[in-house]
Amino acid sequence: MRVHLGGLAGAAALTGALSFVLLAAAIGTDFWYIIDTERLERTGPGAQDLLGSINRSQPEPLSSHSGLWRTCRVQSPCTPLMNPFRLENVTVSESSRQLLTMHGTFVILLPLSLILMVFGGMTGFLSFLLQAYLLLLLTGILFLFGAMVTLAGISVYIAYSAAAFREALCLLEEKALLDQVDISFGWSLALGWISFIAELLTGAAFLAAARELSLRRRQDQAI
């Protein structure tokens, strides 16, 4: 079954735009990591005493949700995370320095993927307009590379979250309280995963278009 270039162009434009919008939304929102302490705040006297000592100066709920740049409490303004690129004048432990390095890695990789998609969109438009085989091939490879950058950024974020959880676990004296805390990844991370899939499909569409154009030119030469 032959696939027309027009159909591939439409598919590439749709999936490429979807990938860009979803990744931009994921980067700009603060629901990558969610900590829900509602069950803990409603539990027995021991936890109430601990939470009471914490809440004397801050009576609002302890639940929070975090993004790539900041963390937000339910009834408090969002606070920015520590800048991972200014470590020279900061004294931190080796584990904290490793966390900051991981933080700096994914805040570079994910916006970089957006930039690659912008360049891919421009070269993709020109490649379909000019019907240039090499440009179609280059654009497909560019989108696939961008998808790998997105995957790397998301993977580093997941590893960063796990390492931060282990660090908090080591510092927490009442480890049993974590059984009453619901910790999960949020919908911002889900948008990142969907963007990664759409970016893969965009790259595949451009490579399929390059192959279709090559086959068409071979047939024309044979005639």
From Swiss-Prot:
Q: Does the keyword DNA-binding apply?
A: no
Quote the cellular component terms of the Gene Ontology held in the record: apical plasma membrane; apicolateral plasma membrane
Species assigned in the record:
Homo sapiens
List, alphabetically, the PANTHER family matched. Answer: TRANSMEMBRANE PROTEIN 114 (PTHR20516:SF2), TRANSMEMBRANE PROTEIN 114/235 FAMILY MEMBER (PTHR20516)
Q: Record's Pfam families?
A: Claudin_2 (PF13903)
The record's gene field reads TMEM114
Q: Where in the cell is it found?
A: Cell junction, Tight junction; Lateral cell membrane; Apical cell membrane
This protein is called what? Transmembrane protein 114
Q: Which InterPro entries match?
A: PMP22/EMP/MP20/Claudin, TMEM114/TMEM235
Does this UniProt record's set of keywords contain Glycoprotein? yes
Q: Which family does it belong to?
A: Belongs to the PMP-22/EMP/MP20 family.
**Membrane topology label:** Multi-pass membrane protein
Q: Which residues are glycosylated?
A: 55, 89
Q: Which residues cross the membrane?
A: 7-27, 106-126, 134-154, 189-209
Q: Which UniProt keywords apply?
A: Cell junction, Cell membrane, Chromosomal rearrangement, Glycoprotein, Membrane, Tight junction, Transmembrane, Transmembrane helix
The disease tied to this protein in UniProt is: Chromosomal aberrations involving TMEM114 may be a cause of congenital and juvenile cataracts. Translocation t(16;22) (p13.3;q11.2).
